């Protein structure tokens, strides 16, 4: 998917990236014209997701908030983690974020699909672009055709390579496969 980026390119960082899309959002929005309660529900859901960065902070992992970015726009969400943090294990933390968010959405009867990949990305506050985002979007569109989150092979390989310092390679592989 992603071609090699010139080594002198200092804009992109290597990141684990998830692109999530709320399914049927256009139809839901059309329904909000007639149903003010539904409009409030959608607003509350999007605010909840946008606040996930604040609400899901984990003080036991101090580097996490510097390594993670979350952006919400319309019916989509992007979460990224720099791949090489102080103790690695970024894919694990991304998967935990995704599982919490997806559980919250399912509880609210909101369905989604998404994709996780690894690659070059610029993601800072509200600005997000790069080959990894395009790849995640294309995987979401082409592979995740029903409610689920697909993890591509590149993300798994890099997740194992950049494993937590607390796990062996085999432990990390087993853990990632179980998720």
Language-model regions, residue ranges each:
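Catalytic NTP-binding/metal-coordinating core of nucleotidyl cyclase/transferase enzymes
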Residues: 2-107
